[in-house]
Structures are given as C-alpha cells and as structure tokens.
C-alpha cells in the first residue's frame, strides 16, 4: 500500500511514519540466517504494523530485532535516526523540502568525526531510505521523487582515508590473557572465558562465535576443528590447540545433550548477543589496565590478524584464517609491519649516502 508523502499532521510525525515503514521493510528483506528468536521478530513486526509514537519506541524495536538475530537492521536504522533528529532542528513543514543539498549539509554535520567506513554506512542507509520513499509514496497517482544519490558528497576520503584498526601488542595480549585467567563472572565464568579465548585464538567474528553449535566442534590429534557459518551463508573451518581451551570446553559440554544446541547461551537458553560479548571484553581490558579507543570484541579479531601477519609475513594466511573474500581486505594488516618500515628507512639512508 502506498501513502501520501506528508501523511501525518507535521514533518516530524510524517518522517517517523516513513522511518517505521522502512524499518519494517528491512526486517523482512535482510538475511535471516542468524535469526535466533522468530517470536521476537514477529512481535516487532506486529508493533511496527500498529505504528510507533516516537523515535525512542522505534529505537527499542530496532534493538529488539537486532537481539533476535537481525543485526543488520541497526546498520540502516542508526544513521537514519541521527538524520531524523538533526532534520527536526530545521523546523521543516513538509518532507518535500528535503533535497540532496540539505542531506549533504546534515551528513557533513553529523559524520565529521567518523571514520570513512562509518560515513559509507551513512551514505548507503540514506540512499536506500530515500529510494524506498521514491517507490512507496503516492498522491493523486503521482509520486514525489527525491532522487538522492550523494555522488558528489565529499565526506568520504577514499582509499587514502583508511583508518587502521585497533589491536593489542604482544605485551598487552599477555596482560589480557592473565585477566581472563583471573576473571570471575560468577555463574558464567567458564562460558565467558571460553568464548573470549576462542575469538582471540582463532580470529573469528563475534557473530560467528555466538552461533557455534556443539556439533560444529570435532577433534584431530592435538587440535579442535571448529566449523564456522560465515558471511553469505558460507562455511569455513578454524583450528585451535586443545590445550588452550580443553578444560573450559569439557566443563561447558557437560550440560549439552544435543549436538544441535548452541554452545553459548544465557540462563534462559537464548543465544548471547554481540553487545554482551563486547561488554565482557571491555571488563577484561579494564582489569588488565589496557586502554583503547575501541574496546569491543572485534578488536580481538584485529589483534589476532595483526600478530599473525607480524609473525608469519603471509598475507594469504591472514586472508584464509580470517575468512576474507578478498586479499585487499586483509592488506590493512600490512600497515603494522615495522620491519618493512625499518627497511625503507635504511634504503633511504643508503640513497642519501650515495
């Protein structure tokens, strides 16, 4: 069903109406391969069909959908929430007043301090949202076309603006591992230690770790082989030395009867969330006295990849270990190769001496 663009009594309510429609559209078009709680998703869809009263209510529904397993919804909703809040300062009376020039002005204000990767997320979300509006609004058998493409938005610096990921040094990693050994998470100590160790020693994504099932783990001599459901419904395997997690895995597996059961769940039997795992990492970093700009669990993956490349100098190995589709994605970790920088400095000195 199509609706007039200015379907509510004022700009704010009309924009909120369309944003809720868009979120509902994304919930039912994004990949649901990681969906863990269909009932929760059904409840969110029902609530969106009834309509929301304010942006906070819509925010809560988006978070509920993410916790149900549709993590991609926040990639679209969070940037649009910021745009919505900022546009309200302009005191517009109609959505038809929005044009590309205004959107560029808004994005310049709210993304100035963000990385290029985050700016690209904003660009994708904004273009996708207004494309949705182009196709869904109709009044007197005509649609208002925004045609927002942001081709000339200068907010993204390109390849030279790549931001290097945060990672721990070997010394910091030792402190972090000591913090794991001494950590006390009450009834969740064994489970929490196990998931963090698997991530840091294999470099898998948090989304991959929380979806590991008992049946995904097999043994081969002194190794555990873990079958991972990766991006794009693809599968790969990672390996970890038994001695690193043997006791923890043995204690956790005692409580599992079915090999189809997820390894990491809470006391209600529902899967752990990515945000929960990141909070564990933040606590451990704090206890270890390690301060980083980004303290989330993804930093463990960057640490694994960086130290692996520094040790082996093998970019293909990093690509295979991390499950990157492209070698260019793995190339970011070569920026931390001080040996190459020292060699360049030596060559420069030799040139000056000649």
UniProtKB/Swiss-Prot annotation:
Residues forming the catalytic site: 205, 231, 298, 301, 324, 333 (o-(3'-phospho-dna)-tyrosine intermediate)
GO biological process terms, semicolon-separated: cell division; DNA recombination
Listed GO MF terms: DNA binding; tyrosine-based site-specific recombinase activity
Regulation acting on activity, per entry: FtsK is required for efficient recombination.
Signal peptide from the UniProt entry: none
Pfam families: Phage_int_SAM_6 (PF18644), Phage_integrase (PF00589)
Protein function: Site-specific tyrosine recombinase, which acts by catalyzing the cutting and rejoining of the recombining DNA molecules. Binds to the complete atypical dif motif (difH) site and to both halves separately.
Protein name according to UniProt: Tyrosine recombinase XerH
Gene: xerH
């Amino acid at each position: 069903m199509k609706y007039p663009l200015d379907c509510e009594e004022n700009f704010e309510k009309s924009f909120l109406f369309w944003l809720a429609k868009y979120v509902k559209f994304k919930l039912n078009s994004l990949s649901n391969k990681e969906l863990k709680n269909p009932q929760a998703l059904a409840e969110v869809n029902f609530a969106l069909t009834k309509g929301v009263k304010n942006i906070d209510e819509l925010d809560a529904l988006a978070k509920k959908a993410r916790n149900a397993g549709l993590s991609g919804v926040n990639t679209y909703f969070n940037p649009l929430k910021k745009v919505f809040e900022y546009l309200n300062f302009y005191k517009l009376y109609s959505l038809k007043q929005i044009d590309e020039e205004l959107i560029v002005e808004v994005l310049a204000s709210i993304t100035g301090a963000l990385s290029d990767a985050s700016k690209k997320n904003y660009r994708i979300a904004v273009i996708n949202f207004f494309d949705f509006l182009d196709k869904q609004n109709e009044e007197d058998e005509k649609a208002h076309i925004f045609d927002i493409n942001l081709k000339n938005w200068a907010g993204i610096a390109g390849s030279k603006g790549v931001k290097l990921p945060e990672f721990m040094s070997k010394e910091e990693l030792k402190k972090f591992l000591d913090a794991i050994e001494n950590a006390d998470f009450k009834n969740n100590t064994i489970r929490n230690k196990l998931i963090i160790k698997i991530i840091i020693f294999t470099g898998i994504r948090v989304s991959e770790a929380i979806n590991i099932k008992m049946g995904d783990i097999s043994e081969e001599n002194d190794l555990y082989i873990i079958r991972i459901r990766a991006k794009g419904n693809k599968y790969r395997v990672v390996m970890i030395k038994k001695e690193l997690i043997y006791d923890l895995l043995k204690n956790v597996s005692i409580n599992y009867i079915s090999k189809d059961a997820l390894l990491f769940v809470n006391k209600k039997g529902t899967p752990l969330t990515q945000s929960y795992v990141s909070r564990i990492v933040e606590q451990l970093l704090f206890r270890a006295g390690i301060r980083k700009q980004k303290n989330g669990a993804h930093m463990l993956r960057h640490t694994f990849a960086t130290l692996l490349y520094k040790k082996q100098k093998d970019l293909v190995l990093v690509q295979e270990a991390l499950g990157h589709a492209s070698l260019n994605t793995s190339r970011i970790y070569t920026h931390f190769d001080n040996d190459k920088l020292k060699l360049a400095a030596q060559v420069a000195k030799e040139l000056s001496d000649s």
